[in-house]
Amino acid sequence: NYICARALINAKAWVPQNRIRAYMLFFHREHFSEEFVLIKFQNFLDSLAEKGKTEDTPFISIRSKAPNLEEYKITKGTWAALQKHKARHLEAGRGFGYGLVDDKKPTRTLSARYAKDGAEILIKEPYWRVPRKITVEEGLALMGYNNTFGKQYGFKRGFTFPETMSKAQIYKQLGNSLVPEILSEIASIFVKK
């Protein structure tokens, strides 16, 4: 007894990350008309999907200027393994492998397995032989968890994680998240103006 509106939305218009997610909303027929769900709301979702296809947010907009990024550097062994893995897949005609960030473009998708080796999103720093992972702050920004947005929802110090959480746990939480600004935009259609 429900009507469904759905869309695949890429978050790169809101945050500097290619992150395509399926958004499916179900409306009970007793409370919402087919006209609202299948026309008005579906058109609204389609416009968000189109925005995600046509607009980009560059990574440079959130890139850390922090002086101490050494702790995020991957090891030489991990870097060698990632390069070997990518070369093997390129040779076989497949596109698997690590991804280096281009500051002018959105990154690849941050996944829950990111803490393992950071392969999806690696950042080259000048004069470094090996790249680094994103910082926790960059991870928060990559998902749209910025201080301005956090304060809007009552988080006085912005979005933070408990100090007892490891970086691996934080990356996993971020990798499993949705971009809150997209959810907020979807919910905005229900707010009476």
Spans of features found by a protein language model:
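Class I S-adenosyl-L-methionine
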Residues: 1-109, 113-115
